[in-house]
Amino acid sequence: MKSDIHPKYEAVVFNDLASGAKFLTRSTVSSDKTIEWEDGKTYPVIDVEISSESHPFYTGKQRIMDSAGRVERFNARFKGFGKK
């Protein structure tokens, strides 16, 4: 078995820039930025623009974008489709 071919797997803090939430998890990504976590230890921190804390799908704040009534037009066009 080859040695030293696997990436370093370590504890990392992910910082959600949209909501301000922080997650301590393990990952192979690394960063020069560090942060002191609640346990008093210092961990590398990765800034992410969106996570499950701020994504509309997970927060329940998703909206269906209907541009120019396309959904209504589709429903009107195929209203009786498949019925005999």
From Swiss-Prot:
Signal peptide: none annotated. Disulfide bonds: none annotated. GO terms for cellular component: ribonucleoprotein complex; ribosome. The keyword Ribonucleoprotein applies. Transmembrane segments: none annotated. Keywords: Ribonucleoprotein, Ribosomal protein. One of its GO terms (biological process) is translation. InterPro entries: Ribosomal_bL28/bL31-like_sf, Ribosomal_bL31, Ribosomal_bL31_B, Ribosomal_bL31_sf. Belongs to the bacterial ribosomal protein bL31 family. Type B subfamily. HAMAP family: Ribosomal_bL31_2 (MF_00502). Part of the 50S ribosomal subunit. This is Large ribosomal subunit protein bL31B. It comes from Renibacterium salmoninarum (strain ATCC 33209 / DSM 20767 / JCM 11484 / NBRC 15589 / NCIMB 2235). The lineage of its organism: Bacteria, Bacillati, Actinomycetota, Actinomycetes, Micrococcales.
